[in-house]
Curated annotation (Swiss-Prot):
Record-linked SUPFAM superfamilies: Eukaryotic type KH-domain (KH-domain type I) (SSF54791), Retrovirus zinc finger-like domains (SSF57756)
Alphabetic keyword roster: Metal-binding, mRNA processing, mRNA splicing, Nucleus, Repeat, RNA-binding, Spliceosome, Zinc, Zinc-finger
Protein name, UniProt field: Branchpoint-bridging protein
Lineage: Eukaryota, Fungi, Dikarya, Ascomycota, Saccharomycotina
Start-end of Polar residues biased regions: 84-93
Top-level taxon of the source organism: Eukaryota
Pfam families: KH-I_KHDC4-BBP, SF1-HH, zf-CCHC
Compartments in which it is found: Nucleus
InterPro entries per UniProt: BBP-like, KH_1_KHDC4/BBP-like, KH_dom, KH_dom_type_1_sf, SF1-HH, SF1-HH_sf, Znf_CCHC, Znf_CCHC_sf
Length: 507
């Protein structure tokens, strides 16, 4: 009996092929077929396909994949053309979503609509694969490539209500969301309940922003399907960092707060450069290049900068004068003592006797540029005054002259003369030379003969001292100094009067 059954099976296989309808082996005919089951002759679309569903030759792995992609694209295209949108019957079906209606009251998410949308998305994905894998591939005629691909990422706001996910995604003035869009190449929009602040009108928001039926989520759209995962990963990284970071240790949030302070102009940090010199490490009021007015004020009691005499707090010594024992005072005093003596002729120091500056109150000639005269009552600059309690340096002694030499005679300046009325000029004088009479003034000091050993340097210094003494006198009397010119002609002395006549002889 067993051999007879085996023989019948061999005959059936040779005549009809291996068919499970003939060889059901006692199974019920009401059993559900799997998704991959079914017979080719029961599918009316197979007869319309130009490609064969049975491959009778050996193909490589790439050829098999390309053949399957093209076969599936043609199958989906025929289904969409013939409007064959009956979903396959399955034992296990997912729950249907809640109904969604349009503005006209028609339902937009029926089973047929969802199945059509699923087929279109599958064909879009297969066409993208075929364009990269199969050379010279041509898409179906009724195929329209979508302008953008879209996906959603739901934010777990119900699990973590204490975290401000919307603020972290947006950032200060939306800069964080702009950076995510630039990095991923996708457009990211926050939609759902909690994405819009209370009090905003629907006219001020874009289309779809007021759809509060869905929970809080991010809508990620791009022109290619490969960019969608990049946008989802960018949003997911921020959500995970906000969930896993302890409170106060979220680097992203601290960076956003710092950026917001910079935008508002309220950032306070220690490493900002100085606005005066541009260097770091000090504040504006600590900058050494900032000219301080208080450092230009010098106390007249302790000679210290930074305060006036009435604010001086230096102690009084036994003489009733202000003293200062601070390091700054000692350093200033040491610099004044170590300063070299002033260079110049003897008598030019303001405290030197006989220079004429102590009595007249005019600064010495060495403190003014050559060719200028100090005004009456002018005081020398503060830097030239000696410190209180210090003596001027001793005057330099002239070098001894060689023995047996006499100094040259001292040349006295010619007295200023004015023209005298009624006196004709001398016959020898040129017409350009005019006679002048001396101006009455204070008597000149008596001229003393220089010592025998006076050198030329001493004589020249004495002459300059005398000329410096005469300049203040002339300035005080209002007489201008005559320009140097040719020597004036000196009139000869008048002849002596004739002797009186002798008396007549007496008789």
């Amino acid at each position: 009996m067993t051999r007879l059954v085996w023989f019948c099976m061999q005959v059936a296989y040779c005549l009809h092929g291996w068919d499970w309808d003939i060889m059901d082996r006692g199974r019920s005919s009401n059993s559900y077929d799997s998704l991959w089951g079914g017979k080719a002759r029961d599918n009316p679309i197979v007869s319309q396909l130009p490609l064969q569903y049975r491959i009778r030759s050996a193909l490589t792995q790439e050829q098999q994949t390309a053949y399957q992609v093209m076969y599936r694209i043609q199958e989906i295209t025929i289904k969409l053309r013939t409007n064959d949108l009956n979903p396959p019957t399955s034992r296990y079906r997912s729950l249907s979503p809640p109904p969604v209606y349009d503005s006209q009251g028609k339902r937009t998410n029926t089973r047929e609509h969802r199945y059509r949308k699923k087929l279109e998305e599958e064909r879009h994905r297969l066409v993208e694969i075929a364009l990269k894998m199969i050379p010279h591939f041509i898409a179906p005629d009724d195929y329209r490539r979508p302008s953008k691909f879209q996906d959603k990422y739901y934010i777990p706001i119900n699990d973590y209500p204490e975290i401000n996910f919307v603020g972290l995604l947006l950032g200060p003035r939306g800069n964080t969301l702009k950076q995510l869009q630039q990095q991923s190449g996708c457009k990211i929009v926050i939609r759902g309940r909690g994405s819009v602040k209370e009090g905003k009108a629907a006219t001020d928001l874009p289309k779809g922003a007021m759809n509060m039926n869905e929970p809080l989520h991010c809508v990620i759209s791009a022109d290619t399907e490969e960019k969608i995962p990049l946008g989802i990963n960018a949003v997911e990284s921020i959500i995970i960092k906000a969930i896993t970071s302890p409170e106060g240790q979220n680097d992203l949030k601290r960076g956003q707060l710092r950026e917001l302070a910079v935008l508002n102009g309220t950032l306070r940090e220690d490493n900002r450069p100085c606005p005066l010199c541009g260097e770091q490490g000090h504040k504006k009021w600590e900058c050494s290049s900032n000219p301080s007015l208080s450092m230009t004020v010098i106390c007249q009691r302790c000679n210290q900068p930074g305060h006036a005499a009435r604010d001086c707090t230096s102690p009084l010594n036994e003489f009733g004068k202000r003293t200062s024992d601070g390091p700054e005072f000692r350093e200033t005093k040491k610099l004044q003592q170590d300063a070299p003596p002033p260079s110049g002729p003897v008598g030019s120091h303001p405290s030197a006797p006989g220079s004429g500056s102590a009595n007249s109150g005019v600064a010495p000639a060495s403190l003014h540029p050559p060719g200028t005269m100090a005004p009456p009552g002018a005081l020398p600059p503060p830097g030239s005054l000696a410190a209180p309690g210090t003596l001027p340096p001793p005057a330099a002694l002239p070098a001894p002259a060689a023995p047996g030499t006499l100094p040259p005679p001292v040349a006295l300046p010619a007295p200023a003369t004015l023209p005298q009325a009624g006196v004709p000029p001398a016959p020898d004088a040129s017409p350009a030379v005019k006679t002048a009479v001396p101006i009455e003034g204070p008597p000149a000091p008596p001229q003393t003969a220089p010592p025998l050993r006076q050198t030329a340097a001493t004589a020249s210094s004495a002459g300059s001292s005398q000329s410096a003494q005469e300049e203040p006198e002339n300035a005080r009397n209002g007489v201008e100094k005559a320009a140097p010119g040719p020597p004036a002609a000196v009139l000869p002395p008048p002849p002596p009067p004739p002797p009186p006549p002798p008396p007549p002889p007496s008789s």
